Amino acid sequence: MAGKLYIVGTPIGNLSDLSPRAVETLGKVDFIAAEDTRVTQKLLTHFSISKPMVSYHKFSGNKRGEDITARLLDGETCAIVTDAGMPCISDPGEELVRECHEHGVEIESVPGPSAAITALCMSGLDTSRFSFEGFLSVTKKQRDEHLDEIKDFSRTLIFYEAPHKLKNTLDDLYRVLGNRQIALCRELTKIHEEVIKGTISEMIERYKELTPRGEYVLSLIHISEPTRP
């Protein structure tokens, strides 16, 4: 009889946000598939959990997913986790879940925090309709194509961005989407959690003087003002 894959949400910053059900699940499975085993080990140690782990990330290749699926088909249970938040969101976990569906492996969700939804709720922007766009490509051509494709969307746009790329991303957003209202959420649920609101041009000016720190979630309104120089 096949085992089961548990999709387990982990904290996006504050370890106290790990649910009791998630703690129970991580403690009972046969093994854990982790984006970065070093990050997950810190979480397990905090909750006094000892479990064997295998790494599963975007550079793992198809064989790692096949190996995990084979173990599940042999009757083992596995929890898939990402470094922070829900697996499968801007994360290769979706490929493992798809493979489990194809092979008839039972899947169970153990929901947890999501940086995108948390940031949207804190942004004060329209939450009735939104589009999660993940990380923009590092290639300028692909970034421009992505932004051009969504520039007329009538919904709030949500992006993830790393601190070292934030300035370039703000420049690209301004150039392609115009000078929209934006909310920058950083270090969500951590000590230095911050929400900064204004126009894209104001954010560009802000970070001429400041060095971006921490992981960012960007939320933009869908109505653009005329682009200003």
Language-model features, listed with the residues they occupy:
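Glycine-rich, flexible N-terminal cofactor/catalytic loop recognition
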Residues: 1-58
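Short glycine-rich anion-binding loops that position phosphate/pyrophosphate groups of nucleotides
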Residues: 12-15, 83-87, 163-165
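Conserved helicase motor
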Residues: 56-61, 136
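Glycine/small-residue-rich loop that forms an oxyanion/phosphate-binding "nest" at active or ligand-binding sites
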Residues: 68-114
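Class I SAM-dependent methyltransferase SAM-binding "motif I" and its flanking Rossmann-like core
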Residues: 95-153
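Anionic-ligand binding region
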Residues: 143-147, 166-176, 180-211
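C-terminal edge-of-domain segments
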Residues: 211-220
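Conserved small/polar residues in nucleotide/adenosyl-binding loops
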Residues: 221-227
